């Protein structure tokens, strides 16, 4: 299986951040499968970070890609956020938004949606500025390494977040389990692990470019998380899938887990 799995080098050479953003995060067609999934993710992130008490000083977002939607509610609950990705072009795309460069992707429809969820305490521009102020570092990461962020010195995090990343980064189940343990090395004991990802997806498309995904069901994910030294506090599955031209997933899952004080 691994021989046919999209390599890291392919992400560096063929992953186009702008195409990805245009395909999956344009809120223009609110009724598309992609928009429905994005709204679901935003609602769950709001629930986790604004209603359920997942908060603290430091949140590390693993595999941010070129996106910021996953941090719009988190910036209300964490003083500092570190964004990370494997591909340089995704980090560059994030920097464009952080620096308000004119060619940065327009997240304002998504930001407005989150502000509505949060009761319109602030307007979109203020929310964007709050997130920009919260993001303290933009770092390279590789979840398959025992030190996912290399030698960068960071205090143990209160929360590690990963959305739509691990399935694409791990070619097999043992690698997936190791990646979860590697993420645990970034967390303080009792710290939160928040993951959202597709279920049973073997690929996703960006235009004509196909990228591999590790097709895991709920039971495999739950077992891997527990084996990696966490206790699961919340696990939700929805049946909504991406458009058939975009991916072959069978729903998505969201989970909140906590790192055990003593490793298994």
Swiss-Prot record:
Keyword Metal-binding belongs to the record: no
Binding residues for nicotinamide: 197, 213
One Pfam family here: NNMT_PNMT_TEMT
Modification Citrulline occurs at: 18, 132, 181
UniProt effect for mutating residue 20 to A: Loss of N-methyltransferase activity
Description of post-translational modifications: Deiminated by PADI1 and PADI2.
Reactions the enzyme catalyzes: nicotinamide + S-adenosyl-L-methionine = 1-methylnicotinamide + S-adenosyl-L-homocysteine
Segments traversing the membrane: none
A biological process term (GO) from this entry: positive regulation of gluconeogenesis
Residue numbers binding S-adenosyl-L-methionine: 20, 25, 63, 69, 85, 90, 142-143, 163
InterPro entries with a match to the protein in the record: NNMT/PNMT/TEMT_CS, NNMT_TEMT_trans, SAM-dep_methyltransferase, SAM-dependent_MTases_sf
Subcellular location: Cytoplasm
GO molecular-function terms, A-Z: nicotinamide N-methyltransferase activity; pyridine N-methyltransferase activity
Any one cellular-component term (Gene Ontology): cytosol
Activity regulation summary: Inactivated by deimination on Arg-132.
Gene3D superfamilies: Vaccinia Virus protein VP39
Miscellaneous field: Prominently expressed in the stroma of high-grade serous carcinomas. In tumorigenesis, regulates the epigenetic reprograming of cancer cells associated with increased cell migration and metastasis.
Quaternary structure (record): Monomer.
Protein's recorded name: Nicotinamide N-methyltransferase
